[in-house]
Amino acid sequence: MTSIAGEGLADGRQGRSIAAIARAAVRQAVAAVRHPSVLFVFTAGGNPERGTPDAALVAAREAQALAPDAAIVAADAPGVLATGAEREAQLAASALCLDRSVLRVALTALPVGLPREGHESALREAAARLPEGESRGVGVVALLGASAHTPEALMGLARHAGAPLVGAGASLVAAASPGVAPIACAAAVAALAGPLRLDVVASPAVRSLTPWMRVTRQDGPFIVTLDDRPALDVISDTARAAARRDPLLVLIRGVDDEAPLVRTIAGADPQRGAVAIADILPEGSAVALGVRDPAAARDDLARRLAILARGRAGATPAAALMFTCAGRGKALFGATDVDARTLRAKCPAPTAGMQSAFELAPWDEITRAHLYTAVSAIFHRPS
């Protein structure tokens, strides 16, 4: 029996090499689909001594051998996800295959040697593409390898307009178009079109410790004062009161108060009482201080997925991609499969994904890099 989407998950029980494990995951995913159009493959190398340095490329080759007519995007990461399951710190692979009847793809692979100054324009153009003959996109999936973890790359994607853009930062990325041999690449961008709707849920794993405060003075990446107090004093006082080992995080307020953009504190200037974050905020921005929190993470993801499910009553989830921060998983929850099971409870559809260095999702109508966030990209069939 064929479907419009298929998934696969494999680990050391299916083989002792990335090639064998990826092959097993892809075979499961492809078997469910009559006419594969796009195939996402995610690998995890586990112990670096056992891992494969070109794991994404190996996976892409295995995928093309089994689905030669599909566009293939492969990425290597600390862990992989499938429906209700996660695999961390071990050799594993997951795969998601979608049928040509529901999704068509325009795939762009950025060369590994592309200079940083070329990342912005190349990614902006890749995200704006449409499959041949299509006038409207469903969404864009962008996976960035380590060499494309650059401000220029993020700026190129931030300016994307139109269909939702999701994705993540991986260690290795590879891609292949039908009839073209797979290549390792700096980034792979799959622009999708078809009779599906893509809905995105981004859920940060944080709990706020302070009220919202105004950035009353800033200098580039440095926040100098918060509500006219030296920012370093505010952070020091909050850290003492919280008495937690977890580092404080800066939460940037958006349109949705309960979905802040999370940033780490990157440094301090004691002379000015300023702190630096990996972002530039205009004066007047509202921020709070917070920490990672497993209960808040679990509850927020479940709540947001429930809201989406109610809003899409009558529409059927067809498939999902999930990108979760590598700072979540067992390290945060003390147990495996938490994010994947939470998604499955509200979206019982073929799923694949990975743990990531950062996540890409819309925030205040702009694509931004997220931290400590679970991003669920759910493809719905119209009611």
Per-range role (PLM):
Residues 1-64, 70-71, 75-349, 354-383:
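Small-residue-enriched flexible segments
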